[in-house]
Amino acid sequence: LLAKALADDRGSGRAICYVDGQPASVRHAALLNACASHTVEFDDIFKDGGYHPGSPTVSAALAVAQDRGASLEQLHRAIIAGYEVGCRVSLAIQPSHYRFWHTTSTVGTLGAAVATAMLLEAEADQIAHAIALSTSFAGGHQQNLQGDGMAKALHPGHAADAGILAGIAAAGGVTASLDSLHGDKGF
């Protein structure tokens, strides 16, 4: 349903949207691929963090890597970095975070941002800003996870899309508050 609803927003690019096997823009492909992965509950789990890192992180990394023509090594390094950051943050915020928030959606945004920034060959300070920016884009509450409707499946798609936005912006020089994870009014 989402692929049909977003058909006019496909854009152009070399990322593959596995929903239909056609090329699309990076953000379009990542969004739909992450949603599809989570819809069929075909994603991994980091149980200690209550987090499914694969849907948002791998979907973002794969789309960016395909579009940029990145090597398999670059893709692997980006995914590993995205997992490392996402899983560590998920450990730090649980179990209280999951009471109101869907960790895959919130923390997934951070993992996707790191993977994207890595593939864009961002410097360390830019990767830090990608994380900081992504904390402002993180969302996905428990009501839509546990309640009626189809919103749950969109959570990792939004995380992948928002993470890509954060990674691209930071690699392009956009900055954010570097205490956004641990500040009094931060994540």
Where are these regions (language model features)?
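N-terminal core-entry segment
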Residues: 1-187
